[in-house]
Amino acid sequence: MKILLFVTLIALAFVALCSAEGNVVVLSPDNFDTVVDGSKTVFVKFYAPWCGHCKKLAPDFEILADTFAPVSNKVVIAKVDCDQADNKALCSKYDVSGYPTLKIFDKSTTAKDYNGARSVDELLTYINNHAKTNVKVKKAPSNVVDLSPSNFDSVVLDKSKNVLVEFYAPWCGHCKKLMPDYEILGNTYANEKDVVIAKIDCDAADNKAICSKYGVTGFPTLKWFGKQSKDGEKYEQGRDLDTFINYINKQAGVNRVKGGKLAVGAGRVEQLDTIATEFIAAAAEVRKELVKKAQTVVDSLPEELRTEGSYYVKVMKTIAEKSIDFVTTEIARITKLVSGSMSGKKADEFAKKLNILESFKSK
């Protein structure tokens, strides 16, 4: 009897686990009436796995479920896969003819269609209003600088910084569409001390004079304020991430890829690459002269490149003292170090060292 009870409990636990994905409750004919019982507000997504709009909505729907999880006694975020044979009658019952279809059961077993915007903020506001709750999304720290009259000049007109500014309005559809990629852009350049990704809300009364000053008449307007010119060059290229990144890399003289890692070749200096190639093929006496030649090049480099330049010289001296095997062992050592959870400036430093060491490998 005890064994039977134990097995039954395990089975029930398994069913419970299968009825949720994260904090999104998975509905089926077996549990629909139990969940949508009129005791709480239930927001349901009727979807199909192959539907492109459904796939696009999925991450935000999970955020929505996570946000309402602390008040799950009042609000449930759920979904029904209408592509599953067992669920087709359920989807038909609620007149689902396209995907995704969103419906709210407002402490009732009667559904109301939701036809508003599908952003997290819009959905959150809608459900809060119906359920009389006041939950808020915990937003991740942003690497996009918010501008206002109090900091615009100190950030944008700083001649030591390259600054991309988005002039936007919160109600603007194109601005909303750009927002996720613009956040990724901010993350991509977070470790570049000379590059700033910023935005200013032109709908805010205090900001209108600034937006007018820079000739903003439509949204979003993007302007580049480089170190050499603070007039604000209008950005008129594509708004996809790759185009943004290529533009900023070229304008600012940096070498980032999406997400913030350094691209292959970052930290390399062409003149020193040439000397490195000569160095590995040269005899001992010639190598001494090449070290001096490399140091002369380093001394002539801009301040921001001298750390990398000095590493070329350090590698040359180490090879001269030990052997060319140093390159292989050092690459292995650094690769092992960066394979962990290293990030930020240290990760950049080691990435540049790896790139420089590649220039000493036998061609």
Swiss-Prot record:
EC number: 5.3.4.1
Swiss-Prot/TrEMBL catalytic activity: Catalyzes the rearrangement of -S-S- bonds in proteins
Protein's UniProt keywords contain Disulfide bond: yes
Keywords on record: Disulfide bond, Endoplasmic reticulum, Isomerase, Redox-active center, Repeat, Signal
GO biological process: protein folding
Pfam families: ERp29 (PF07749), Thioredoxin (PF00085)
GO CC list: endoplasmic reticulum; endoplasmic reticulum lumen; lipid droplet; nuclear outer membrane-endoplasmic reticulum membrane network; phagocytic vesicle
Gene Ontology molecular function: protein disulfide isomerase activity
Thioredoxin domain boundaries: 21-132, 133-285
Span of the signal peptide: 1-20
Compartments in which it is found: Endoplasmic reticulum lumen
Official protein name in the record: Protein disulfide-isomerase 1
Organism whose genome encodes this protein: Dictyostelium discoideum (Social amoeba)
Taxon lineage: Eukaryota, Amoebozoa, Evosea, Eumycetozoa, Dictyostelia
